[in-house]
Amino acid sequence: MAAAPGARLLRAACASVPFRGLDRCRLLVCGTGAGTAISPWTPSPRLHAEAGPGRPLSVSARARSSSEDKITVHFKNRDGETLTTKGKIGDSLLDVVIENNLDIDGFGACEGTLACSTCHLIFEDHIYEKLDAITDEENDMLDLAFGLTDRSRLGCQVCLTKAMDNMTVRVPEAVADVRQSVDMSKNS
């Protein structure tokens, strides 16, 4: 089976970064559809690797964005305020929050490594039913989240599609960071 574009580069990049344990090198594959295994050998329109906190590695050149490549996303924060921004098709909702510097305290504390549930979001019914299937790892983290609903997902695991244009996602009033057992309530 042929390797995905950039897979060889990904393996080399992860191997060349000094850190303890290869388990800290993760691969986020967006836009591949439900049931896709996350692996450097999976063909994907977008590959992004990370080697530990604060060590992003680009393994493929991102296409230049045009206004057609972006959609509008509305985040309803803990105070009920709606934050409206644009996000690139294929980016995760965590990427959107970070790249647009949205004021959502504590959101994505683990930087998308599935080690916390601080990017917990609640989706509208018509959007939730179109999302890719949830993985066991994401489900395990969601079990630890405050305010869990039947429409809850982690923002680091949901990638934008055109069908999500103008969606509204709600940030729960309280968040649990399982790494520190910290409650960041509405006051944050």
From Swiss-Prot:
Known cofactor(s): [2Fe-2S] cluster
Record Gene3D superfamilies: 3.10.20.30
Keywords recorded for this protein, A-Z: 2Fe-2S, Acetylation, Cholesterol metabolism, Electron transport, Iron, Iron-sulfur, Lipid metabolism, Metal-binding, Mitochondrion, Phosphoprotein, Steroid metabolism, Steroidogenesis, Sterol metabolism, Transit peptide, Transport
A cellular component term, taken from the record's GO annotations: mitochondrion
Principal location: mitochondrion
Localization per record: Mitochondrion matrix
Keyword Manganese: no
Residue(s) carrying N6-acetyllysine: 70
Residue span(s) of domain 2Fe-2S ferredoxin-type: 69-175
Modified sites of kind Phosphoserine: 67, 181
PROSITE patterns the record matches: 2FE2S_FER_2, ADX
Transit peptide limits: 1-64
Role of this protein: Essential for the synthesis of various steroid hormones, participates in the reduction of mitochondrial cytochrome P450 for steroidogenesis. Transfers electrons from adrenodoxin reductase to CYP11A1, a cytochrome P450 that catalyzes cholesterol side-chain cleavage. Does not form a ternary complex with adrenodoxin reductase and CYP11A1 but shuttles between the two enzymes to transfer electrons.
Quaternary structure note: Interacts with CYP11A1.
Protein name: Adrenodoxin, mitochondrial
Native source species: Mus musculus (Mouse)
Gene name per UniProt: Fdx1
